[in-house]
Amino acid sequence: MSRLSRSLLWAATCLGVLCVLSADKNTTQHPNVTTLAPISNVTSAPVTSLPLVTTPAPETCEGRNSCVSCFNVSVVNTTCFWIECKDESYCSHNSTVSDCQVGNTTDFCSVSTATPVPTANSTAKPTVQPSPSTTSKTVTTSGTTNNTVTPTSQPVRKSTFDAASFIGGIVLVLGVQAVIFFLYKFCKSKERNYHTL
């Protein structure tokens, strides 16, 4: 093999490695669609030993009439809890209520799940993930027992397969190989034209 052929082969190898490394960095990310899984309720046995003392709710929590507005973060220094009892649901700053469920995040509110809408040119399937935040539910009976359930969040996956990038990579590699092949043939034909005297 001549010196020029070895140099050309070395350049082609380096170019191929560069293409593989740069293709690894050029990945596309698609929006994540999150669905919320229902959380089972926690109940405890009623204890009737101590009377329940309640404090009147401040005006900021008392004026809110929906679960989502109860957790509005625009009001400074306000911690409100959405309380769901058998007969009524309301917003309060007091989390110690007998025989009711107390929620402290908007995940406690019943929200319809979003359905992913694929675009016309997309070949990747949407990834459905659980919400990264956690939800806490507390069931308090009149007395001393508080049970809190906090589910753990699963790690977020961002890997998707993009068919357009895959096909583009194949076309790029085949194009580079064709250029190298024709350069090699061109150099070989020049070597054959020269004759020693």
UniProtKB/Swiss-Prot annotation:
> Which ranges make up the Extracellular topological domains here?
24-162
Give the signal peptide, or none. Answer: 1-23
Give the Cytoplasmic membrane side ranges: 184-197
Listed InterPro entries: CD164_MGC24
| Region span, Required for endosomal and lysosomal localization | 191-197
Q: Where is the composition biased (Low complexity)?
A: 125-154
Tissues expressing the protein: Isoform 1 and isoform 3 are expressed in hematopoietic and non-hematopoietic tissues. Isoform 1 is expressed by prostate cancer tumors and prostate cancer cell lines. The expression is greater in bone metastases than in primary tumors. Expression in osseous metastasis is greater than that in soft tissue metastasis. Isoform 2 is expressed in the small intestine, colon, lung, thyroid and in colorectal and pancreatic adenocarcinoma. Isoform 4 is expressed by both hematopoietic progenitor cells and bone marrow stromal cells.
Its subunit composition reads: Homodimer (isoform 4). Interacts with CXCR4.
Indicate what this protein is called per its UniProt record: Sialomucin core protein 24
Identify the species of origin: Homo sapiens
